[in-house]
Amino acid sequence: MTAFLNDFSKFYGTGEKNEAGQNLEEFLELYDSRKYETPSNTTDAVIFAYEGESCDSIDGLKVLLVKRSNHPSIGYWALPGGFANMRENLDETARRELEEETGVKGLVMEQIATYGDYDRDPRTRVITTAYMAVVPENAVKVQAGDDAADAVWCEVNLQGVSTEERENDLKCYGGAVSDLEKQMEYHYKLHVKNVSRGLDTEAEVVQTICGELVREEHFQVEKAGEIAVDHSAIIVQAILTLKKRL
């Protein structure tokens, strides 16, 4: 099989042959990527908008959502995003999908998280990389396109509900939690609203943190409302990330 890259000169290593007696060219010629089942990769973008001259608080923020016109989660609201092309870097995917679905382009975008639970998509194994951007609301024009039935700014409000401390939870660190480690659970309600579109929904998300110096952090959707898949968890993580910087 032809190598995926035309120029693979930086992959020679020491130039020695492998145990099968193959040099790099021979190895690539026989390598069959179809032999292994592999995940698909997507990006999703959390685009926040603020009013006024600067973004000083998470209060009053809006988030850009698209309405899905096809399965899965048809009719629900989602973050703009989609599948990465084979010869496209993830940053390029995030910008392309954002422009195709909403018409928004030219933003500074930061990669904030990866979501890879095996059961997050019924079509196939899909791992998504989440991006975040913040813009003045009047600086961009939103117009739905591609497979988005609609694209709008939505009011978003995050409310902390409760905090729980647990010890020796076997879910943390794959069941190898030290007696000294604590597991903290933070419960949130995410309210998303757009009056003109008849959208008024609430999601419940749990943030779990294990460890201190090295932290294992997860965001899990307990109740999705009308927000597709795990996108409410991604939005909550983005809001909390932004809140730390304001």
Describe the role of every protein-language-model region.
Residues 1-246:
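N-terminal leader/linker segments that precede catalytic domains of diphosphate-processing enzymes
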